[in-house]
């Protein structure tokens, strides 16, 4: 159904996705987990930061899609990358909820989320691939996994964001998370080049 070139098309975008996702998460999940006392404002700041950076990265990469396609000399990457990069929009909404689930040891809930996301996205990806959508099936599978996972994390986590946008708590977490960002970016670059 899928051949190596289909995986290669999606794989070409992996470096962009990996670096942008690392910056979007910014090590704040680990920073929240590391804090002894976490307030609503801390989770809220991470939620708004990751959501807004998700929108920003999607817009940047959406408009850079022709440049990415030109770099690889693959015009098909324009449409494909614009679909794959939707993961930033969906993923940003689940980062703070995921940190809450992790911090409060809601392991059973996280396992359910992963299983449901995997089964649903796998079904959709296989169905699309069997119907001739090739690498688009892989792309939709990926964003479906991210989207369902983010939605379920939001549902399962008792914490909910509010519209009181205050990014000040991020400054306090940044001393811890900044080291993780750099390490993770270098790791992603070395793994994807």
Please state what every model-predicted region is.
Residues 108, 112, 151-192:
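Interhelical loop/hinge segments that connect adjacent transmembrane helices in multipass membrane
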Residues 7-8, 42-43, 77, 135, ...:
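Primarily residues marking transmembrane-helix entry/exit sites
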Residues 1-14, 66, 70, 78, ...:
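Membrane-interface helix-loop junctions in multi-pass transport and translocation proteins
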Residues 29-30, 65, 98-102, 125, ...:
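Interfacial helix-capping/hinge residues at the ends of transmembrane alpha-helices
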Residues 31-40, 90-113, 131, 136, ...:
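Membrane-interface junctions at transmembrane-helix termini in multi-pass inner-membrane proteins
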Residues 19-20, 59, 63, 74-100, ...:
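Alpha-helical transmembrane segments of multi-pass membrane proteins
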Residues 9-13, 21-66, 79-85, 109, ...:
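Membrane-water interface segments that mark the loop-to-transmembrane alpha-helix transition
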Residues 64, 68, 190-193:
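Hydrophobic/aromatic end-of-helix segments at the C-terminal termini of transmembrane alpha-helices
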């Amino acid at each position: 159904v899928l051949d190596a070139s289909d995986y290669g098309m999606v794989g070409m975008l992996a470096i962009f996705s990996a670096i942008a996702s690392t910056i979007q998460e910014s090590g704040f999940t680990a920073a929240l987990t590391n804090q002894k006392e976490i307030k609503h404002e801390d989770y809220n700041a991470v939620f708004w930061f990751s959501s807004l950076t998700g929108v920003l990265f999607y817009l940047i990469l959406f408009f850079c899609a022709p440049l990415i396609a030109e770099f690889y000399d693959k015009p098909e990457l324009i449409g494909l990358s614009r679909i794959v990069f939707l993961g930033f929009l969906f993923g940003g909404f689940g980062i703070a909820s995921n940190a809450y689930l992790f911090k409060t040891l809601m392991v059973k809930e996280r396992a359910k989320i992963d299983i449901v996301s995997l089964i649903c996205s796998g079904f959709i990806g296989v169905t699309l691939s069997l119907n001739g959508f090739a690498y688009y099936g892989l792309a939709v599978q990926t964003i479906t996994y991210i989207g369902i996972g983010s939605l379920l994390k939001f549902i399962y986590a008792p914490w909910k964001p509010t519209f009181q946008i205050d990014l000040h708590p991020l400054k306090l977490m940044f001393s811890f998370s900044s080291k993780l960002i750099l390490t993770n970016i270098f790791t992603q670059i070395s793994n994807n080049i």
